[in-house]
Amino acid sequence: MAWNRKHLLRLCTLLVMAIGLSACSISYKFNGSSIDYTKVRTISFETFPNRSVGFVWGPMESMFNTALQDIYMQQTPLEQVKRDGDLQLSGEITNYDAYNKGVGADGYSTMAELRMTVRVTFTNKSNPQENFEAQQFSASREYDASQQLSAVQDELVNQMIKDIVDQIFNATVANW
């Protein structure tokens, strides 16, 4: 008899949980975007030129532009068009520079910091209150100053680009 009660109690518990959960509605988008796809179907990107006042590293411009377009193509069903998209992104890389971060007892730099800043203008034709102009997005990475920048530059720039692209995505379509 105890065995049947035990199973009956478990069955009742599962039934109550199933009814309770079916009454709940949880909505979560795994891509993080909050776009109304009935109004927004296309996106256009202008090339973000490298107008840095600091260093100029040739591959950075194309790396950034590719990463920016990729995040929207991978995380939204938006169609990329050459111009006049429902969403429009334009801007420029305004800063890319290295700075001494820490000095050792011998007076030489021990840590250096690489910084990158991008200025972005965003237009949402279906929801103009989300537009912004000349908003700055930045990222930085530290590295051991005993290393040559050329030895760590590719990895650090990729990390900074990922950070900045995520910031832009969140500011434009994720509404965090």
Predicted regions and their residues:
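A structural "domain/chain start" motif
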Residues: 3, 22-66, 70, 170-176
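Surface-exposed short loop/turn segments
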Residues: 31, 74-79, 83-132, 136-151, ...
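Compositionally biased, intrinsically disordered linkers/stalks adjacent to structured regions
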Residues: 153-176
